[in-house]
């Protein structure tokens, strides 16, 4: 393989899948370093509204179509939400994500959230991003006007495979939301979930769809099977396959931020350190929405042990 090789089309990307792991990782590491050097960015999220979602996503513990025993609650009180954002603002995280379950916030909830965000000091607000479901162009413009420049909305998987995991919203509807994010002048944090039963071709088509949309911030999650969901019995990915997915994505999206998020402790286990060799340059630290993550202290120690450095630049 030549230095800084990238996959220009799905056929080239499929050839990468069968490469020896060490060869694949060498190329992925070179590509990561070419754009990000040894800088790693962290983000953390706040579960601001949990459960009772009307979507029927087969993997999701928050869907009311499933019966996973999780804590459910409406939008956090304003003071509590503000306090949790400010607390994360003291940590070395480049981004603080406010996440709500469900297809969309009500008008009253959205206005409340805007009020909380407006009350934040600028040095914290500029690090906040939001994941609030399907928003209109007007709502996205309101977020942009108060200082939010990034919005999270996943496509989850390939357009072909998506109907296998959700029927209450189409892939094209999700794509339209991402396009509205760009139309509002914001950057989109858009990725998905792996280990749903999708094929390698689905994964590669998904990566090229993100590239076609111009997505430059890609959260990568690995299925953590939840009880009482249709995918409760789905075997988790092996660590080797999960790392290979990251490396192939790096060859398709050479300059994008690849952020390893949900499922990291379960799927990668003792191989978590290898995410950077596989091409990732960012990770989510702390707990996820309804599952336990890895603590900030442990993640900082891991990054330091590898001779890498934490970058708090919110543009990453």
From Swiss-Prot:
Its cofactor is [4Fe-4S] cluster; [2Fe-2S] cluster. The lineage of its organism: Bacteria, Pseudomonadati, Thermodesulfobacteriota, Desulfovibrionia, Desulfovibrionales. [4Fe-4S] cluster binds at residues 53, 57, 60. Catalyzes the conversion of dethiobiotin (DTB) to biotin by the insertion of a sulfur atom into dethiobiotin via a radical-based mechanism. Pfam families: BATS (PF06968), Radical_SAM (PF04055). It comes from the Bacteria. This is Biotin synthase. It is an enzyme of class 2 (transferase). InterPro entries: Aldolase_TIM (IPR013785), BATS_dom (IPR010722), Biotin_synth/BioAB (IPR002684), Biotin_synthase (IPR024177), Elp3/MiaA/NifB-like_rSAM (IPR006638), rSAM (IPR007197).
């Amino acid at each position: 393989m030549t230095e800084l090789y990238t996959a220009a089309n799905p056929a080239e990307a499929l050839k990468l899948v069968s490469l020896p792991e060490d060869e694949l990782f060498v190329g992925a590491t070179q590509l990561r370093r070419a754009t990000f050097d040894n800088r790693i960015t962290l983000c953390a999220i706040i579960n601001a509204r949990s459960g009772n979602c009307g979507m029927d996503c087969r993997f999701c513990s928050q869907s009311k179509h499933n019966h996973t025993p999780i804590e459910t609650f409406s939008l956090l009180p304003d003071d509590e939400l503000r306090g949790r954002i400010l607390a994360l603002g003291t940590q070395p995280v480049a981004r603080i994500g406010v996440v709500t379950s469900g297809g969309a916030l009500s008008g009253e909830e959205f206005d409340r959230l805007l009020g909380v965000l407006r009350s934040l000091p600028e040095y914290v607000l500029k690090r906040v991003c939001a994941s609030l479901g399907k928003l209109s162009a007007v709502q996205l413009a309101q977020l942009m006007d108060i200082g939010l420049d990034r919005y999270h909305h996943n496509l989850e998987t390939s357009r072909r495979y998506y109907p296998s995991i959700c029927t209450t919203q189409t892939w094209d509807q999700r794509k339209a939301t991402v396009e509205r994010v760009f139309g509002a002048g914001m950057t989109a944090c858009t990725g998905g979930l792996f280990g749903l039963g999708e094929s390698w071709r689905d994964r590669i088509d998904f990566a090229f769809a993100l590239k076609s949309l111009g997505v430059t911030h890609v959260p990568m999650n690995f299925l953590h099977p939840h009880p009482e969901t249709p995918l409760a019995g789905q075997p988790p990915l092996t660590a080797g396959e999960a790392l290979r997915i990251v490396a192939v994505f790096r060859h398709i999206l050479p300059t994008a931020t690849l952020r390893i998020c949900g499922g990291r402790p379960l799927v990668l286990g003792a191989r978590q350190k290898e995410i950077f060799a596989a091409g990732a340059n960012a990770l989510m630290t702390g707990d996820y929405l309804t599952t336990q993550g890895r603590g900030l202290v442990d993640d900082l120690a891991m990054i330091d042990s590898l001779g890498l450095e934490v970058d708090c630049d919110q543009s990453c």
